[in-house]
């Protein structure tokens, strides 16, 4: 059983994957984020989520593959601080799950994480699970 608090008035919610399953780039985390409580899995019909490829290296660059249509032009759903928090968290969670599952760094292995940005602007991990290749 997984229990977590209900987040009211969240700034954003999303899914982060510790590799890039969609554009097949090397050395990136894939981030898919919606504004507020609009779900990634079942969004409002006209809502487009923000897609980011985040370099795995701390402080490294990011690419907005697709901007959200729920923010002003030129604005982002995730701040630089949020992306840095996600980068750090993805590295830690992937490493710990890799060890738990007995996978070496040579094995194909990745983690899929659901996250929230709370109304206080803090990253909260809702759940993490291995990506199935």
Where are the language model's segments positioned?
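Nucleotide/phosphate-binding sheet-loop regions of phosphoryl- and nucleotidyl-transfer enzymes
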Residues: 1-133
């Amino acid at each position: 059983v997984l229990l977590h608090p209900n987040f009211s008035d969240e700034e954003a919610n999303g899914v982060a994957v510790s590799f890039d399953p969609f554009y097949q780039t090397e050395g990136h985390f894939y981030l898919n984020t919606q504004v507020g409580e609009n779900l990634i899995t079942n969004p409002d019909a006209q809502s487009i989520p923000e897609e980011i490829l985040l370099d795995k290296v701390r402080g490294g660059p990011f690419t907005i593959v697709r901007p959200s249509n729920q923010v002003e032009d030129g604005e982002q759903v995730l701040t630089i601080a949020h992306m840095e928090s996600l980068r750090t968290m993805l590295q830690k969670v992937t490493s710990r799950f890799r060890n738990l599952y007995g996978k070496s760094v040579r094995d194909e292995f990745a983690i899929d994480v659901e996250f929230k940005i709370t109304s206080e602007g803090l990253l909260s991990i809702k759940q993490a699970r291995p990506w199935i290749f």
